[in-house]
Structure formats: structure tokens, C-alpha cells
Amino acid sequence: MMFISGDISMDVEMPGGLVGGIKRKLLAGESLFLTRYLANGAGAVGITGPFPGSIRQHELDGEIICEKHAYLAHHGDVEIESAFAQRLGMGVRGGGEGFFLQRLKGKGTVWLHGGGDFLDFDLVAGQRLIIDTGCMVMVEPTVTYEVKMQGGIAKSLFGGEGLFLVHMTGPGHVTLQTLPFSRTARRVLAAAGGGRDETGGGILGSILGE
């Protein structure tokens, strides 16, 4: 939340009860609790993302699967759950971060956040899309996905890319982010002299300490 103006009250709730809250905390790294804003009269609530990027308003009527940090807020009858990966390999990201997801279902308005800009694909049945593990923001449940090792260890050592990529198959809509936070953080840390930019040297950079 960035600001509140007018006659707005705040409350705290735990969607899904204690079990649902613990799942969100352990599997997706989210808070046990969510803040509810209630309009008692005229007013406004301003929301912002946790890092530089873009915010999109999505009209939900059914179900979508989101990257764990994509969800910002919602209005209406929307349930938030932790979503398990469709394949065992989905629990591992090339950058060392778990590929954990959230499921949003119901009917209402949802606000999603992504680093950089959004890039959208409408996949037809059987159409494939291969993406970096950090670039996913949202997919429809009709899209199947799994993580696969790409091109062997040698390519990762010298190519500057991670070991794993997400293979998606339509039909369905996919939304990507052009600048994932993990990538931005590595670049900032490297520029500040406090770490290394692994995006430029892959695993080899880690081995050599670059």
C-alpha cells in the first residue's frame, strides 16, 4: 500500500485459515495475513509494487496461475492458494530460487506486478513457448509447463544462462516480465561491488568468483 485517502478502514485477515496461511508462507514466501481495505464512504487506496516495474489490472473469471511475487491486490470474490508445480523439476530454478506459484480463482479484479514491462502470448493448442524461469508472471490453467535442463552443462558454463528453462505448451494465455527482480538485484549487487553478476558468466562465473 502506498496511500489511503478518504473514509477507508483497514482490517487484517488470514485467507484459507491457519493452514492456508502457513502454505502461503512456507511455499510461496508470502505473509500469513492479508490487509483488507473497506470503503465506508468516498475514498481511494494507492498500491505499488515491491520493486520497479509495471502493474496490470486483470479481470478474473475463473482461475490463473501466478509467479509467487506477482499478486498485489484484488477486489471481489477471489481465493488465493499455493499452487504446486506440474512437474517435479518445477521446484528448482536456474538461479537457485524455488519455482513456487500461486493460484488465484474466483470472480473479481486482480492487480498483478512484474519487473520491467509485460509481454503477452496467446498460445494455440500445441504451440510451445520456452522461457527463462524468472520471467513468468501469469499463465492460464490450460497451459502445461515443466522445467527442463537446457543444452547441457557446457552451455550453462560458458553461455551465461541458467541450467533450467520453462517449457510451456498451449492453449492459453501467458504473461511474462522483461526484467525479473532477481536479475535486477544481481546487477545492482555487482555494480556496488558486493557480489558478482552471474547473468554474464553463468556457472563458470560462480566457479571463478567473477
Enumerate the predicted regions with their spans:
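Composition-driven recognition of glycine/serine/threonine/acidic- and proline-rich low-complexity segments
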Residues: 1-210
